[in-house]
């Protein structure tokens, strides 16, 4: 697997970018210079490709400990495939940064200069001063505000080759292709259509227990204004339109620095609950507003490939505009959950809570949907006719056929002549066409490309 290393002096935002790209809080971040001294690493996916992301310690000659960190960082950089060098956009370029950057450039690897903390027009003007580093690829970011990352991801994706699949999915897909006969309908795994498992997640005190109580119409969990009252997961079931909906009320997730004892255990339980859920209700506090921790929790939901409904609780106390809020969530904070419906409720008064029950049934139906192979291929043919596949260095790229090979979540295989040539933007176009035609609201849609008649995912 290819690796991407984040390098830069202390406090330029490496750990924040690492957390943003990993969609979870792994590295400790603060405004104190040099908070991260050890090398952190985690597997990530950028669009349809996977990579190992490495967060190095800060480069600084002023401290004996940091001299050792710098030595180790340069060693790891030599072993990495792609280098992202971060600088602070609120400060003028200095000779030390240039020296570090030029030493990395000599390694002959793909390298980009990432100017972080570009939060306003004044910062944008100052960022141009970094052009004298003599590098073609410069990206202005505001990691805190999630601005500028799309361009960086698109550049990174060009250098990544290994396709991302859900853990254990590679073996499942290859086994499917080995036994599948083209043109025939596939027998899917059995999914109990009458029992739906729903996990309720969110940070502390957003009203998850109140929501559960409103859904089941009884006081099952202890409800209190004290943060973190609910520690143990609590299961309750309701019957709605002849379907059993089992709810799990999870302990609230705090910022990691505040997690102690039972709450640390509860955080681990939350992960386990998500792994056994089919649909997640991601509860947000519409009165207090949203923060970075909400995004981390949303990342946990995305990581488990669940159906999802975003619940704006305490809406009766909110002064937000609903349409603007939905746009902010889908286009900014939760781009990776842009398919999730957003529903406003007031758990305490019970207002609009009933809407959730119908929506859960609808999302579950989408989550377990089976697409007829002939209809899927008709759609793919029409889509490629309307917008032909781009050539790969002058060579024709062709999709022979498409087939759904799994459900819950739905997974589709594209059998091609040159699967690695399928750009993420074209795959996203196909995803949008499939979503529009077959209604996959609220569920992730996995698309994998494979070479015809081979387990290889590219031409030999």
UniProtKB/Swiss-Prot annotation:
GO process annotations (BP): ribosome biogenesis
Chain positions recorded as GTP 2 binding sites: 202-209, 249-253, 313-316
Residue ranges constituting the EngA-type G domain according to the UniProt record: 2-164, 196-368
GO molecular function, one term: GTP binding
Domain of life: Bacteria
InterPro entries in UniProt: G_ENGA, GTP-bd, GTPase_Der, KH_dom-like, KH_dom-like_a/b, P-loop_NTPase, Small_GTP-bd
Pfam families tied to this protein: KH_dom-like, MMR_HSR1
Keywords: GTP-binding, Nucleotide-binding, Repeat, Ribosome biogenesis
Binding site for GTP 1: 8-15, 55-59, 116-119
Stored HAMAP family: GTPase_Der
NCBIfam families, per database record: GTPase_EngA (TIGR03594), small_GTP (TIGR00231)
Subunit structure: Associates with the 50S ribosomal subunit.
Family the entry assigns: Belongs to the TRAFAC class TrmE-Era-EngA-EngB-Septin-like GTPase superfamily. EngA (Der) GTPase family.
Protein name (record): GTPase Der
Originating organism: Campylobacter jejuni subsp. jejuni serotype O:6 (strain 81116 / NCTC 11828)
